[in-house]
Amino acid sequence: RGPATLVDETVRKVWQIDLSKVTVSGTDWDETVASIVKKSSYELGISNENVVTLGIEAHLYKVLLYEKGGHFKPHKDTVKEDGMFGTLVIQLPSLFTGSDSNVSHQGQSKRFKLSKDCETSFQYTAFYGDCEHEILPVTDGWRFCLVYNLVVTKPNKDGVFPDSRGMEKTVTMLQAEAAKWLTTNSGRVG
C-alpha cells in the first residue's frame, strides 16, 4: 500500500529479492533494456522520437520470484517516483506453467500467456499506471522477473507528455486496429 509492502498471501504470494543484493549486468544488458523501453513505449502509443525527447527510461524497482501457487490479485500500481507513468516487467528465462497475466483498462482486457517459450527466452509486458493487472497462479515451476518503473526524465513545459498533434496518426491507427480486433474476436479475450 503506497510505498509500504503489506504481506497478505490471499492478495499476493511472491518472493521479493532486496535490490541491494542484486546486480543486473551483462555484455549488452543496458542496451537490451533500452531497446525494450523503446519498443514497449511505441506499443503504448509513444513515438520513438518522443521516447528520446521525453527521456523515457526504465528504473529497476523489484526483483520477483513466483513459486508454485504464486499470484497477485487484480491491482493498479502506485506511483513510486517522479515522472513514473507505467510499469515494465521483464521475465527472465525460467521453467514454469500457469501464471498468465490479465491487463484491463476501461472495460477492455487482454490475457498474456507468460509461460509460452519461458524456458528459452525472456519476455516483457508494459502497461500504463492506470491499468488494472493481475498474475494468475503459477501451477508448476518458478517464474523470475525484473520489474521496472517507466519514467519520463525530461518532461516538457506543459507536463509529462508532449502535445498530441504528433500522435494523431498513431491514435487513428490504434483505433482501426482495435475495431478490427473486436470484430475478429467478437469481444473475446485470450
Outline where the language-model segments fall.
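Signature of the catalytic double-stranded beta-helix
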Residues: 2-70, 76-79
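Intrinsically disordered, low-complexity regions
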Residues: 3, 14, 135, 168-171, ...
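Alpha-helical interaction elements in eukaryotic regulators
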Residues: 32-36, 40, 84, 131, ...
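Intrinsically disordered, low-complexity boundary segments flanking structured domains
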Residues: 42-53, 77, 89-90, 134-135, ...
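Catalytic core of non-heme Fe(II) oxygenases with the double-stranded beta-helix
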Residues: 56-59, 63-159
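Eukaryotic intrinsically disordered, low-complexity regulatory regions
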Residues: 153-190
